[in-house]
């Protein structure tokens, strides 16, 4: 028989840097999950990512206090800033442009995010990522 789900925990944790300090410790502690077990498993699974890259994770906690977790792809905003070589986006994106990004780089990001996005096709996902870029003050050029 399948285990009964107690709840879900959604977090963004830096790749290879999960530790018991906030926000990981308190979120898992509330559900009674073994924090160190999660940290070791998460760090092992995110070795392939660049250290410090924010990785969204959905943790499924069961009533017997066991858990499973699923990692997602990094946020589009992080990937866009990395591709543009910037630290942060614009505070006023419609008036202040902070950089430019090539459409080919946006397409690559859309392909990376394809597993997590619910777009109909790669073109729709690319347009969605372009919108994110514009809302951050980036100019998308051909």
Curated annotation (Swiss-Prot):
Lineage: superkingdom: Bacteria
Pfam families: Ribosomal_L11, Ribosomal_L11_N
GO cellular component: cytosolic large ribosomal subunit
UniProt-recorded Gene Ontology molecular function terms: large ribosomal subunit rRNA binding; structural constituent of ribosome
Biological processes annotated in GO: translation
CDD domains membership: Ribosomal_L11 (cd00349)
InterPro entries: Ribosomal_uL11, Ribosomal_uL11_bac-typ, Ribosomal_uL11_C, Ribosomal_uL11_C_sf, Ribosomal_uL11_CS, Ribosomal_uL11_N, Ribosomal_uL11_N_sf
PTM info: One or more lysine residues are methylated.
Cross-referenced SUPFAM superfamilies: Ribosomal L11/L12e N-terminal domain, Ribosomal protein L11, C-terminal domain
Keywords: Methylation, Ribonucleoprotein, Ribosomal protein, RNA-binding, rRNA-binding
Subunit structure: Part of the ribosomal stalk of the 50S ribosomal subunit. Interacts with L10 and the large rRNA to form the base of the stalk. L10 forms an elongated spine to which L12 dimers bind in a sequential fashion forming a multimeric L10(L12)X complex.
HAMAP family named among the record's database cross-references: Ribosomal_uL11
Protein function: Forms part of the ribosomal stalk which helps the ribosome interact with GTP-bound translation factors.
Family from the record: Belongs to the universal ribosomal protein uL11 family.
PANTHER family documented for this protein: 60S RIBOSOMAL PROTEIN L12, LARGE RIBOSOMAL SUBUNIT PROTEIN UL11M
Protein name: Large ribosomal subunit protein uL11
Organism: Shewanella loihica (strain ATCC BAA-1088 / PV-4)
Lineage of origin: Bacteria, Pseudomonadati, Pseudomonadota, Gammaproteobacteria, Alteromonadales
């Amino acid at each position: 028989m399948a285990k009964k789900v107690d709840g879900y925990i959604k977090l963004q944790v830096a790749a290879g840097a999960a530790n018991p300090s906030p926000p990981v410790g308190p979120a898992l502690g509330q559900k009674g999950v073994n924090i160190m077990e999660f940290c070791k498993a998460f760090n092992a699974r995110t070795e392939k990512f660049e250290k410090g890259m924010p990785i969204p994770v959905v943790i499924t906690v069961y009533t017997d206090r066991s858990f499973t977790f699923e990692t997602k792809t990094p946020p589009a905003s992080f990937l866009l800033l990395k591709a543009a070589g910037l630290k942060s986006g614009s505070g006023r994106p419609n008036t202040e442009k902070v950089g430019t990004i090539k459409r080919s780089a946006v397409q690559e990001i859309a392909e990376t995010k394809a597993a997590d996005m619910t777009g109909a096709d790669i073109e729709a996902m690319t347009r969605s990522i372009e919108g994110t870029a514009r809302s951050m003050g980036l100019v998308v050029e051909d």
